[in-house]
Every structure is written in C-alpha cells, then in structure tokens.
Amino acid sequence: MVIGLSHYLTVSAILFTLGVFGIFLNRKNVIVILMSVELILLSVNINMVAFSHFLNDIVGQVFALFILTVAAAEAAIGLAILVVFYRNRGSIAVEDVNMMKG
C-alpha cells in the first residue's frame, strides 16, 4: 500500500479539527488551549511537508522547520507567562486573565 497525498491531508485535517474543537470546547484551561494551538500548527506543518514532498520542492520543508521553531518559542513563552500568572493569582483559569489589566 502506497501512502499518498490524501493520507497526509486526512491526518492533517483530523489534527486541525481536534485543535479547533479543543479551543472551542475547553474555554477553562489555558494549557489545553495552548496544546490545541500546537496541534493546529502541527497540522499545518504536515500539510506543508506533504505538498513539498509530492511537488518535489524543498521550500515547504524549510518553511515547516521555521514554523516549528516559532511554535517552540511560542510554547516556551506561553508556559513561562502561565507560571508567572499562577504564582501571582493561584490559578490558570481563563476567566482570571482579565484581572491582569493594570
């Protein structure tokens, strides 16, 4: 059995849908929202690498590596902000984020 472009796009669509559902169904926990955003970015990367492979163009793979780097930095900064927020407020609920106003 040959794994074609449609298989990669199906996996990517499933990951993207899970990420969107994770954002919209769980509005309480910031960590789950961050993980859902990472799932969405991963699905975009799978699309880029799959199209890059099947079109014999390396630009998509290079851009996917760039997106992975930015996503790792985004996750590190987001988790650092969550740690500081938890130390100050004692919770990481999304409802408490509006209390961060000056």
Curated annotation (Swiss-Prot):
Domain of life: Bacteria
Residue spans crossing the bilayer: 5-25, 31-51, 65-85
Pfam families in the record: Oxidored_q2
Bilayer topology annotation: Multi-pass membrane protein
UniProt main location, coarse: membrane
Quaternary organization: NDH-1 is composed of 14 different subunits. Subunits NuoA, H, J, K, L, M, N constitute the membrane sector of the complex.
Protein family per UniProt: Belongs to the complex I subunit 4L family.
HAMAP family cross-referenced by the UniProt entry: NDH1_NuoK (MF_01456)
Name assigned to this protein: NADH-quinone oxidoreductase subunit K 1
Species assigned in the record: Rhizobium etli (strain CIAT 652)
Name of encoding gene: nuoK1
